[in-house]
């Protein structure tokens, strides 16, 4: 994960979430994305997180910090973020975009039921390098009873 890209999302959105997951290490999130960050050192508390993210104190003052402890990767904020989940559906990228509230969103279609899922491609920027260099990236959708979530996995 490219930490500087995550920091840019935090500064832009004013929100930083750190989840300590017992069976999976540290995850970093924004209001609309969450990233596995197991390559980072264990960090607890605002001061350690700010230091690891290398954010100036003045910029950090504008960020809402949320820290959580979760029991399993299968239930982070009620979502199963394990490598594979029963019932996940493959998707295909479409040449369609939409701009709800002025934010351009890319589109993927579920291969099973044809449902369209719009998401902000910019939220994948911390993973862009890994996505580009990976031989195997699979985009799937998982439904948890609420709204769909799109995942990319290597």
What are these regions (language model features)?
Residues 1-154:
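DNA polymerase processivity clamps
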